[in-house]
Amino acid sequence: MTRKDAKERKELTYERARKLFETYSRFALVKIENVVSTQLKDIKRQWGGNAELLMGKNSAIRRAIADLGKPELSGVYDLVKGDVCFVFFKGNARDIKKAIDENVREACAKVGNVAQRDVWVESCITGMTPDKTSYFQALGIATKITKGKVEIISPYKVLSEGDKVGPSQANLLGMLNIKPFCYKMTMHQIYEDGVIYDSSLIDIGEEDIFTSLRNAISTVAAASLGAGVITQASMPYNVRNAFKDILHVSLGADFMIKEQSMVMAN
């Protein structure tokens, strides 16, 4: 690409970014490291016409934000760094994230990759012939021959999370057809009508909210009862305890009250 082509491309990014920031009041900041073109196509197909992806030079995107002069976008300006991209959308952020999370690519381990998690080779019959036994022995993997095939006797930890993949680990995992890496577009922050929040918040459903509220009310009620302070949360328990006290007094005094007969009937 010539310098002229690069400049023209940068200007196109600027113009498109400016138009998108003017048109949409909702967008997400995403990263697409190790995401292949087929994944992007599948994600865009699921989005349909409800979302647009913006990729390009950060300097052009920052300039577009600055030139718009919208105070509500000032917090976004500082987030435009690294390999960040933008997804502008019309509908629900949860639907946008759902399409992203459904398009995951499993990948083989390559030399130099950093392990995303602990990787184990489980006990199994590998399907490899006995001539491969020496290879496993060199790695310290206990094996035996079962029906003419190499069997791994006990689980073997190939990589720990954060380890760099070496040639022997990459070769072993490749031979066993183990794909320990998963790559997908990752959503980080979401902007909606001037508010920026973490994408993890959209995974919280109504039931999660109701559960948290119930737990909070129970905690407040317990604390109120323990401190002898009447609050709205503790009121049902205060009324119940007061009724129990009245009932005990009436029973002790051999004095019948209407509520007592109702309880005894139940």
From Swiss-Prot:
Keywords: Cytoplasm, Ribonucleoprotein, Ribosomal protein. SUPFAM superfamilies: Ribosomal protein L10-like. One of its GO terms (biological process) is ribosomal large subunit assembly. GO terms for cellular component: cytosolic large ribosomal subunit. GO terms for molecular function: large ribosomal subunit rRNA binding; structural constituent of ribosome. The keyword Heme does not apply. It comes from the Eukaryota. The keyword RNA-binding does not apply. Ribosomal protein P0 is the functional equivalent of E.coli protein L10. Belongs to the universal ribosomal protein uL10 family. Component of the large ribosomal subunit. This is Large ribosomal subunit protein uL10.
